[in-house]
Amino acid sequence: MVVPAGTDVRPTSDRVREAIFNALYSLDDAVAGATVLDLFAGSGALGLEALSRGAAAVTFIENNREAATALAANIESLGFADRSTMIRMDARRWLPTAPPFGVAFLDPPYAFAEWDSLLSALSATLAVVESNRSIAVPPRWGLVRERRYGATVVQIVRSLASLE
């Protein structure tokens, strides 16, 4: 997998990625057949893993030019172009126009602080939040699972609207 040089992109480690997908599998195999969003996609590791595990389609949103170039190469080299949409745009500007998703991966830079507005704008059944700290889960979301892996905290949240 191509990863752009520098510190702007922090790919999810293999260990954390495996743990995330095991957790999603335990939640009624949430990825299989789902429409997936990889927001702040970077190299696309999470969305590409979702495609390899049977996601119907993945929309990748990445604003960084170098990361978007690497992501496009990764999509092509793995043969997922037919089930992938890549948009080079700021995630916060794109999200209000987004369709609903089954699963959304949210892995912004660790300094990101706009979680409440990001989750408020997101329309998804499940969201996987990756950060260096626990985030406060907004009222319309319920915490399903939280785990720490070294410096990384992964929270899986479910839209309370999906339970109605």
Residue ranges of predicted features:
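Class I S-adenosyl-L-methionine-dependent methyltransferase catalytic core
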Residues: 1-164
